[in-house]
Amino acid sequence: MKIGVFDSGVGGFSVLKSLLKAQIFDEIIYYGDSARVPYGTKDPTTIKQFGLEALDFFKPHQIKLLIVACNTASALALEEMQKHSKIPIVGVIEPSILAIKQQVKDKNAPILVLGTKATIQSNAYDNALKQQGYLNVSHLATSLFVPLIEESILEGELLETCMRYYFTPLEILPEVVILGCTHFPLIAQKIEGYFMEHFALSTPPLLIHSGDAIVGYLQQKYALKKNACAFPKVEFHASGDVVWLEKQAKEWLKL
């Protein structure tokens, strides 16, 4: 099966990596809207328009399924995109909630949602979690992580300062952290390490990774089996510099 993966930039590589590892599709067309990243600081109307324009991009490629790997677009544009599409479109929020249902049985477990400003303000995760009975939910807009990751700053003083700025004021330590932006799994180990070191935790919080979550979701929904296909062919496209995007993909995905 030939599918598409849409993201605002390189963050969707975290989803793509999980898809490549699972080998459940034959061919993947990746489109990064890198000329307009970040999405998280833009208004909902603009994000919806970006989503519809992404649909126009994919039409000539004749894909059978589209994955919206961007949490911000999933929160604010997914419904509009689905209305204008004849093929199934899957976002990353519903799979993440399903992963929590499967892994977190304590409905009172403190859950922290990390995301861009736009994703957090949409309340998409908060509302979905409450519908499943999880009421001890807090959220934190951590938009500064996005430009750091886009610049391949995945460790070091700048990232440490950014984590300190966001996480020091936390009053309740989470047992579950939703990485509510597909950029964030690229610094997941650093986030986990920060919580362990600075809050003296005996065990790390459970990190919900949208890439792993969406593979599980797709397997369940479409009865797909891991390793059913050969290693997928991947084709990269971008609204900005596609050469730069391909270079980042080779470095991060080891292609």
Curated annotation (Swiss-Prot):
Q: Which residues bind substrate?
A: 7-8, 39-40, 71-72, 182-183
Q: Give the EC number(s) under which this enzyme is classified.
A: 5.1.1.3
User: Which InterPro entries does the record cross-reference, listed alphabetically?
Assistant: Asp/Glu/hydantoin_racemase, Asp/Glu_race, Asp/Glu_racemase_AS_1, Asp/Glu_racemase_AS_2, Glu_race
- Select a single GO molecular function from the record's annotations and give it: glutamate racemase activity
- Pfam families (alphabetical): Asp_Glu_race (PF01177)
Q: Which residues form the signal peptide?
A: none
List, alphabetically, the SUPFAM superfamilies matched. Aspartate/glutamate racemase
Q: Which Gene3D superfamilies match?
A: 3.40.50.1860
Q: In which pathway does it act?
A: Cell wall biogenesis; peptidoglycan biosynthesis
* Recorded catalytic activity of this chain's protein: L-glutamate = D-glutamate
* Primary enzyme class: isomerase
Q: Which UniProt keywords apply?
A: Cell shape, Cell wall biogenesis/degradation, Isomerase, Peptidoglycan synthesis
Top-rank lineage group of the source organism:
Bacteria
Annotated PROSITE patterns? ASP_GLU_RACEMASE_1, ASP_GLU_RACEMASE_2
Q: Where is the active site?
A: 70 (proton donor/acceptor), 181 (proton donor/acceptor)
Provide the GO biological process annotations: cell wall organization; peptidoglycan biosynthetic process; regulation of cell shape
Q: Which NCBIfam families match?
A: glut_race
Question: What role does it play?
Answer: Provides the (R)-glutamate required for cell wall biosynthesis.
Q: Which family does it belong to?
A: Belongs to the aspartate/glutamate racemases family.
Q: What protein is this chain from?
A: Glutamate racemase
